[in-house]
């Protein structure tokens, strides 16, 4: 069952979902609240839960949940880094996407539970995601890497870190790409975005960066040299136009193309932030496209 996107937009506005992203003070309160009251990791139910087997391992300083299809040996792996503004825990929508990917592609889907701010930092997490990805490649033979929002930033930064050792297909959903927010088209995108806001994102990113400069590719993968971005495996970017991260998605595609790299930019007109995770018709189509992509790589 799909719901119209306008109902999601209305709900976001009604609940003031962007409060912590528009107001720096509210962003700091969110960090303090999450530190004191951590969110649950595994939901009691999510669509597709009964179709997969779930186990948990511990590696590179993180718990990693592994979803594999029932009664099948996995063929390859997908390391998926959840989003949440570097401050929010993995959500049921991430679990639903992971289950759908596992059952329709036959891959093992790995969900690293990385430390969030104020405890986790880019310098700590990026190398560990790289190690987890390389270990998955060694175990399963083929590996893809992806993530949404903050998780997209982490995934792309990790791919840059390990590019000289291994490359793989990369899937980015509404990725955060540049912590400096210097793209001149972002203010216009902000007017259309009912979910995110630059002021709060800057607070979260400054906490995430810690002592790492905001311009470092560990924090802002878009600012890596174009030659390095183009040397990665094929990059598929899903982005909606009602998202403050949309302008940087175009810049990423441009930088990859300028050096002859392989990319695909999938843009949803009026699409919300992380629209492939939403229970809309456009979201379902994007999830199907992601799964089809994973079957062909």
Regions found by a protein language model. Give the residues of each.
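Alpha/beta-hydrolase superfamily serine-hydrolase fold, recognizing
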Residues: 61-65, 71-297
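A glycine/proline-hinged amphipathic helix-loop "lid/cap" segment
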Residues: 1-70
């Amino acid at each position: 069952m799909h719901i119209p996107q306008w109902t999601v937009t209305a709900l976001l506005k009604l609940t003031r979902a962007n409060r912590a992203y528009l107001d720096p003070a509210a962003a700091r309160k969110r960090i303090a609240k999450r530190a004191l009251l951590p969110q649950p990791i595994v939901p009691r139910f999510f669509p597709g839960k009964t179709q997969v087997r779930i186990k948990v391992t511990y590696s590179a300083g993180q718990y990693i949940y592994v979803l594999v299809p029932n009664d099948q040996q996995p063929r390859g792996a997908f390391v998926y880094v959840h989003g949440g503004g570097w401050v929010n825990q993995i959500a049921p929508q991430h679990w639903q996407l992971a289950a759908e990917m596992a059952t329709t592609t036959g891959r093992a889907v790995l969900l690293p539970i990385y430390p969030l701010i104020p405890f986790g930092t880019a310098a700590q997490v990026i190398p560990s995601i790289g190690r987890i990805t390389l270990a998955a490649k060694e175990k399963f033979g083929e590996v893809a890497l992806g993530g949404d929002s903050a998780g997209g930033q982490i995934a792309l930064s990790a791919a840059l870190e390990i590019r000289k050792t291994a490359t793989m297909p990369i899937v980015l959903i509404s990725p955060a790409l540049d912590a400096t927010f210097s793209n001149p088209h972002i203010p216009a995108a902000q007017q259309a975005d009912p979910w995110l806001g630059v002021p709060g994102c800057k607070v979260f990113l400054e906490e995430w960066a810690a002592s790492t400069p905001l311009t470092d590719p560990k924090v802002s993968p878009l600012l890596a040299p174009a030659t390095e971005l183009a040397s990665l495996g094929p990059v598929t970017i899903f982005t909606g136009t009602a998202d403050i991260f949309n302008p940087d998605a175009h810049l990423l595609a441009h930088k990859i193309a300028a050096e002859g790299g392989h990319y695909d930019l999938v843009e949803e007109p009026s699409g919300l932030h992380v629209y492939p995770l939403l229970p809309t018709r456009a979201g379902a189509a994007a999830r199907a496209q992601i799964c089809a992509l994973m079957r062909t790589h």
